[in-house]
UniProtKB/Swiss-Prot annotation:
Domain notes: Both substrate-binding domains (SBD1 and SBD2) are involved in the substrate recognition, and are sufficient to confer the substrate specificity.
Amino acids binding ATP: 212-216, 220, 352-353, 357, 438, 453, 544
Residues reported in the UniProt entry to bind CoA: 281, 461-462
Reported function: Contributes to jasmonic acid biosynthesis by initiating the beta-oxidative chain shortening of its precursors. Converts 12-oxo-phytodienoic acid (OPDA) into OPDA-CoA. Follows a two-step reaction mechanism, wherein the carboxylate substrate first undergoes adenylation by ATP, followed by a thioesterification in the presence of CoA to yield the final CoA thioester.
The keyword Transferase belongs to this UniProt entry's keyword annotation: no
Tissue expression remark: Expressed at low level in leaves.
Pfam assignment, any one: AMP-binding_C
Gene name tied to this protein: 4CLL9
Similarity comment: family membership: Belongs to the ATP-dependent AMP-binding enzyme family.
Protein name per Swiss-Prot or TrEMBL: 4-coumarate--CoA ligase-like 9
Catalyzed chemical reaction(s): (9S,13S,15Z)-12-oxophyto-10,15-dienoate + ATP + CoA = (10Z,15Z)-12-oxophytodienoyl-CoA + AMP + diphosphate; hexadecanoate + ATP + CoA = hexadecanoyl-CoA + AMP + diphosphate; (9Z)-octadecenoate + ATP + CoA = (9Z)-octadecenoyl-CoA + AMP + diphosphate; octadecanoate + ATP + CoA = octadecanoyl-CoA + AMP + diphosphate
PANTHER family reported for this sequence: 4-COUMARATE--COA LIGASE-LIKE 9, LONG-CHAIN-FATTY-ACID--COA LIGASE
InterPro entries membership: AMP-bd_C, AMP-bd_C_sf, AMP-binding_CS, AMP-dep_synth/lig_dom, ANL_N_sf
Length: 562
């Protein structure tokens, strides 16, 4: 059915598609945001939601006594009261110690996840300083490139990571976060009455420079404004308030804090008064132990981790009954795996979602029981968002059921790539549309489906083969723990699909069996035609497969090195 709006657009009530403009509109209720001209930082906004809106986790409780963060390795924790005091203390200390540190200056952060990282993020954002965190295990050349891109005036590191900054000359130098001086800045006795938000921060000001994964080239610095972060936080906050199931939420923080989803999960938890458990180096059994010990109710996962949960015998060893939901993203989740997961964990919901660093995290997700059974879909686009499906060849906007490149527009879309006007213009057009590079389609009910990355399709003769489709089939094999499919150069076909397989321990699965297993389930041009067995599939911190690494390994013939 079509609805005629005041501006004469015709919007289908079921799909949200406007046939005149080619735009898909979110069917979720529009969300009111603070006036754009109101001075407000993302840090102040999140803390105001915690203190003023009485989220479910804080109902009838002393907010300051609630636990915000727990380090699963050491058992150390940080309460919300301590968080507020330390943010105030650090903000004051930084302004006193570095009087020239000004709003819009950039602070580069190179540190493993710890209880102090959220304090540092909030303190810096509250005084208008742009936070730019990077992967602490990155190489010196990678770190040097990120410093060059973000142009910081100051850096925060640890004794273990500071050596990677030796080649970088910063105006205000580098602060060691494990030094006695820094620790003293966190615990000033005179900061209890100080308002850390005295510095005027506009919502249009830059808040963070987060680095893209680099799966399609060298990493870029994604510039997100306070408005971007406020809009993203408002959506997740409102969704949780609408959730009819009210329980104490404890999240397992398996994502690094420098990654956009870890970054946004940190802010979201603050706005809701939730508890986060920091997991150190990721190991499956360590995750199970943490779930059992801290009664974890939810955690972010990638499809390969869902596969591991389905197939692992370790799940019988630990009490995982506290789990209520898993937020799944990073890649499409196959229907077969989702159904097998629900058979094994009938009381755990899979909340599927889609997002990018460039969209400040989630831009679409499932919500509520009816949507969560839409296996294979990443849900509906978020509140206040618009989308297009664009034919890559013609530029034509496509209706439901047709596959093309997903474009997104809304208040969460990045300002651009730092210092890279060309890439910014190529990615976000003059009308504010973000070209995601993902091949997708909407069904007739406004549910979004990810087919594959536009640049990752395998060109077999005149056909295009989506690697994700083959990976989902491979994951359904009981002898396969993990799998990835990449293009392999071929003189006759141009490219052929090559599968990298991680076998179940003790399995004798061979190349011929894999090829036959897939061939029985696909049209001939989609067949896997080459197989290599390896110990682990290389992925980025969000769980996305590093296909370029695998392609290089395949071409070099070095599969045995993994």
């Amino acid at each position: 059915m079509l609805t005629k709006t005041n501006d004469s657009r015709l919007i289908d009530r079921s799909s949200g598609f406007d046939q005149r403009t080619g735009i898909y509109h979110s069917l979720r209720p529009s969300l009111s945001l603070p006036p754009i001209d109101q001075p407000l930082s993302a840090a102040e906004f999140a803390l105001s939601l915690l203190l003023k809106s009485s989220p479910p986790a804080t109902a009838g409780k002393n907010i300051e006594a609630l636990t915000y963060l727990v380090n699963s390795s050491s058992g150390d924790n940080l309460t919300y009261g301590e968080l507020l005091r330390r943010v105030r203390s650090l903000a004051v200390s930084l302004r006193e110690r570095f009087p020239s540190l000004a709003s819009r200056n950039v602070a580069f952060i190179l540190s493993p996840s710890s209880l102090d990282i959220p304090v540092l993020y909030l303190a810096l954002m509250s005084i208008g300083v742009v936070v730019s965190p990077a992967n602490p295990i990155g190489s010196e050349s990678e770190v040097s490139h990120q410093v060059e891109v973000s142009e910081p005036v100051i850096a925060f590191a640890t004794s273990q990571t500071v050596k990677k900054l030796q080649s970088s000359s910063l105006p205000l130098g580098t602060v060691l976060m494990d030094s006695t001086e820094f620790l003293s800045w966190l615990n000033r006795s005179d900061s209890s009455s100080v308002n850390p938000f005295q510095v005027q921060v506009n919502q249009s000001d830059p808040a963070a420079i987060l680095f893209s994964s680099g799966t399609t080239g060298r990493v870029k610095g994604v510039l997100l404004t306070h408005r971007n972060l406020i809009a993203s936080t408002a959506v997740s906050h409102q969704r949780t308030l609408q959730d009819p199931v009210n329980y104490d939420r404890v999240g397992l923080f398996s994502l690094p804090l420098f990654h956009v989803f870890g970054f946004m999960m940190m802010i979201r938890a603050i706005s809701l008064g939730e508890t986060l458990v920091l997991l150190g180096r990721f190991e499956l059994e360590a995750m199970f132990k943490a779930v059992e010990k801290y009664k974890v109710t939810g955690m972010p996962v990638s499809p390969p981790l869902i596969v591991a949960l389905v197939k692992s015998e370790l799940t019988k060893k630990y009490d995982l009954r506290s789990l209520r939901s898993l937020g799944c993203g990073g890649a499409p989740l196959g229907k077969d795996i989702a159904e097998r997961f629900k058979q094994k964990f009938p009381d755990v919901d899979i909340v599927q979602g889609y997002g990018l660093t460039e969209s400040s995290g989630p831009a679409a997700s499932t919500f509520g029981p009816e949507e969560m059974v839409k296996y294979g879909s990443v849900g509906r686009i978020s509140e206040n968002m618009e989308a297009k499906i664009v034919d890559p060849s013609t530029g034509e906007s496509l209706p439901p059921g047709k596959t093309g490149e997903l474009w997104l527009r809304g208040p969460v879309i990045m300002k651009g790539y730092v210092g890279n006007e060309k890439a910014s213009a190529e990615t976000v057009d003059k009308e504010g549309w973000l070209k995601t590079g993902d091949l997708c389609y909407f069904d007739s009910e406004d549910f979004l489906y990810i087919v594959d990355r536009l640049k990752e399709l395998i060109k077999y003769k005149a056909y295009q083969v989506p690697p994700v489709e083959l990976e989902q089939i491979l994951h359904s094999n009981p002898d396969v723990i993990d799998a990835a499919v990449v293009p392999f150069p071929d003189e006759d076909a141009g490219e052929i699909p090559m599968a990298f397989i991680v076998r179940k321990p003790g399995s004798n699965l061979n190349e011929a069996q894999i090829i036959d297993f897939v061939a029985k389930q696909v049209t001939p041009y989609k067949k896997v035609r080459r197989v290599a067995f390896i110990n682990a599939i290389p992925k980025n911190p969000a769980g996305k497969i590093l296909r370029r690494e695998l392609t290089k390994i395949a071409v070099d013939g070095n599969a045995s090195k993994l």
